[in-house]
Amino acid sequence: MLESPGEAPATRETAAARAKGGLLVVGSFVALLFAIELLNTVLLHSLNGVFGLRPRSADGILDVFTFPLLHANLNHVLSNALPLIIFGFLVFLSGLRVFLTAVACSWLGSGLAVWLIGAGGVTVGSSGLVFGLFAFLLVRGFFNRSWWQILLSVVLFLAYGSILFGIIPNIAGYVSWQAHLGGAAGGVLAAVVLRARASRR
């Protein structure tokens, strides 16, 4: 099929709009995390005890929806901020629906894993989202059979692949490997779901 003269500029405009939208959405989310951490610091991190995730606690299941928004301290937020911006932006380039699906699956996967198999105590932090978005970016190209997405996954793996050790219990140390594992599983699930939807079209 021949392309009309207006199609290429329209494609470039769409890509530019997605890039701007990605920076706005992901940047706003990370800014929200810092704002919450500032408030939490003023409150002596009392929010963690209220909205942090407590494994296998019947009254704490709803905390699945809040625990990624909280962190132990400023350094904890900083450690998650940059990968969230990078991975979130790259996912958003595929569109808002793809981004929301990947985030939702990573968020729920991370939370449910902690709630079901967490070691105890209170878990907070958005690292499960980091692992989920990273896993999504690693596998989606193979489901979509997209060479550029596969190439991107190889580059990301070479640059950030070492973080995958965070899903191994004995290596993860004091961080929640359950959140990392659940988030990564959610990211893979998102790639499967989105591929299935595309196949039905």
Report each predicted region and the residues it spans.
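A detector for small-residue-rich transmembrane helices and their helix-helix packing motifs
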Residues: 2-201
